[in-house]
Structures are given as C-alpha cells and as structure tokens.
UniProtKB/Swiss-Prot annotation:
Binding site for Zn(2+): H102, C129, C132
One GO MF term: zinc ion binding
Gene: cdd
Similarity annotation: Belongs to the cytidine and deoxycytidylate deaminase family.
Name of the molecule in the record: Cytidine deaminase
Subunit (UniProt): Homodimer.
BP-aspect Gene Ontology terms: cytidine deamination
Domain of life: Bacteria
EC number: 3.5.4.5
Cellular component per GO, a single term: cytosol
Top class in the EC scheme: hydrolase
Function: This enzyme scavenges exogenous and endogenous cytidine and 2'-deoxycytidine for UMP synthesis.
Positions of the catalytic residues: E104 (proton donor)
Length: 294
C-alpha cells in the first residue's frame, strides 16, 4: 500500500478495510475503481453507491499535495462506464497560484484522460468553489451532472450554478469529454508522440491552440495531459496539470520526472511554453523539450 493511504485506511470500517486491502496492496494503485470493484465493495459492505463514495473520500483526499494550504480536498468522479476516478487538489511551491489544481478538476481530468466518455456524478468532501462549478459546466454532462456532498441531498450542477454561462452561449457544440482528434501526425520518439497524441485530444474551441504534455519517469512510465479550455477562460486547465494529475494519482512524485515534452503550434494564439517550463523547473525537472505541431 502506498504510504499516503495508511492513515485514511486505518479509519475505515473493518468490512471496507477487508474488501479494499487487496485493491490497495499495489504501491501503484491507479486511484480508480472499476465497475466490478465497485460492485464487489458494495456487496462486502452493504453500502449503496452514494454511501460507498462518501466512505472512500478520505482515500481520495489522501492523494492531495497541499504544501501551501494544508487543506486536503478529495473528489470521486463516477463515470457512465461504472468506473470511479479519484481526484485531489494540488499546489506547487515555487510556481504561481494560477497553476494549482482543484480536486474536482483532478477527478474529472483523471476520468477524461483515462478515456471515460461522460460523468454521471461527482462526490466531493467540500462544497465546490465557483471555479470548479464553472469547470464542470464545460462537460458533456452539462448542468445535469449530479453533485454529492456529505450531509446534504444530492443536487444537479444547475442548482449550484444558476443562470449559468457556458459553451452553449458561445455556440460550442463539442464539449469536454466528447471524443476529439485534431489529426496531427505522431513524430519523434515515444515521449514526443505521447505529447502530440495528447494535443490531438485537446478541448480548445475558443483559442484553437492545441497542446499536450508528456512526462517520462525514471522507470520509463509516461504520463500525458491534454489542454482543456473553458468558456469562462480562467478555469481552463493547462496540459501540464493534466499530466501532473495522472503522475500523482498513479503513485509517482515530482522527483520521478526525468524528462518532459510539450507539443503545441508555433503560431498558436496561446502559447504554453513559458508557463510549462517555469512550473516544471520549480518542480525540479530541467530536461524540457518542445515539439511543434504541423
């Protein structure tokens, strides 16, 4: 079991501990539960889906990296496939506040970058901030997304974001988590190709500035993040953050990164290079390359 889970695990009910122990035994537990695993946990504990998700939130929050706030938020995004995806907030010493990741963004990106097609619900241990409510409104599940909070009745996103402004107001038809392929040729080594493939999946209907980041760890594992724009612009998630979300949730740490590649267009209206390289250097990665999409 990864050390970060030990304290939260010890506080779980005995029957949930017994059912989870073989799942969490792998140090690189992928911070997700398949539909089959969810069904097994429900049977072992007698909990329904909502109660089980609440019970698992401490494990999601244990994935948080919060050197600034020391305020850990956990989220579980429930995919329509039946898979549940953990998420947690992330803060980066030496970078800017704008580079931080919210738990809801983490869980949603985890699902999206894992190939999930849509979300049915999201469970969070604290009320989503306005930033996250706006981020969620970019999803193809839209204002119908169910939000579950401890001690409250579940409500749709529309109840948390009345009179919402979103992609439909800008006549955007392709939404976040819809399948997209921008068709750039995969060239270069494996890491470069991973970055280009991530750029091909970008959701960037507002700027038309595709980008993707791929991180290579010392053991050869590669994590890729795609750019995810938002109708309100500021809640946009950069591609580096997508890759860092996966790196963290899959049990790796910043010192494990040995090389990074950013893929973007040289003449795009928005350029990720400066922010990406500055944040990576703050995290200790200095081997950073840029591949131009063509």
């Amino acid at each position: 079991m990864h050390p970060r889970f030990q304290t939260a695990f010890a506080q779980l009910a005995d029957n949930l501990q017994s059912a989870l122990e073989p799942i969490l035994a792998d140090k690189y537990f992928p911070a997700l539960l398949t539909g089959e695993q969810v069904s097994s946990l429900k049977s072992a504990t007698g909990l329904d889906e909502d109660a089980l998700a609440f019970a698992l939130l401490p494990l999601a929050a244990a994935c948080a990296l919060t050197p600034l706030s020391n305020f850990n938020v956990g989220a579980i995004a429930r995919g329509v496939s039946g898979t549940w995806y953990f998420g947690a907030n992330m803060e980066f010493i030496g970078a800017t506040m704008q580079q931080t990741v919210h738990a809801e963004q983490s869980a949603i990106s985890h699902a999206w970058l894992s190939g999930e097609k849509a979300l049915a619900a999201i469970t969070v241990n604290y009320t989503p901030c306005g930033h996250c409510r706006q981020f969620m409104n970019e999803l193809n599940s839209g204002l119908d997304l169910r939000i579950h909070l401890p001690g409250r009745e579940a409500h749709a996103l529309r109840d948390y974001l009345p009179d919402a402004f979103g992609p439909k107001d800008l006549e955007i038809k392709t939404l976040l988590m819809d399948e997209q392929d921008h068709g750039y040729a995969l060239t270069g080594d494996a890491l470069s190709q991973a970055a280009i493939a991530a750029a091909n999946r970008s959701h960037m209907p507002y700027s038309k500035s595709p980008s993707g980041v791929a991180l290579e760890c010392k053991d050869g594992r590669i994590f890729s993040g795609s750019y995810a724009e938002n109708a309100a612009f500021n809640p946009t998630l950069p591609p580096l953050q997508g890759a860092l979300i996966l790196l963290n949730l899959k049990g790796y740490d910043y010192p494990d990164i040995q090389r990074a590649v950013l893929a973007e267009k040289a003449d795009a209206p928005l350029i990720q290079w400066d922010a990406t390289s500055a944040t990576l250097k703050a995290l200790g990665c200095h081997s950073i390359d840029r591949v131009l999409l063509a």
